[in-house]
Amino acid sequence: SVVSSPVVRLYEEDALRLGKKDKFPYVGTTYRLTEHFHTWTKHARLNAIAQPEQFVEISEGLAKAKGIANGDRVTVSSMRGFIRAVAVVTRRLQTLNVNGQQVETVGIPLHWGFEGVARKGYIANTLTPNVGDSNSQTPEYKAFLVNIEKA
């Protein structure tokens, strides 16, 4: 028989570091780039040439609302910390309608860090909450609250 739990793993002290919508009104999500598969950012020079600098993606609507242009340096923050990167304004991300509310997403590739052949960057998981699946202990890096401002 399989034993599983439908609840989340969240320690009491970590619950105090979860953001609130009024201060962090956007949804952050991390993802990988083909050019930087796993640790290639740190070791493969050609991939660093193809995509040399840390960036975040935002929709045209969010860019307009925040006065951010393609190529601007931005700060993305959560209750746990912040990163700085170049803004990429894209049609790939759209404003979502969730239960009648408009929701904006900030896409954050996870490959940059303090070492490697690409330009040094910030660790994307600085922003992510310390929340996980109670069965697999897999951390939740795909949906968390953030804010974004022009740097």
Spell out what each predicted region is.
Residues 39-151:
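Long, contiguous, secondary-structure-rich segments that constitute the structural scaffold
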Residues 1-44:
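Long, low-complexity segments enriched in small/aliphatic residues
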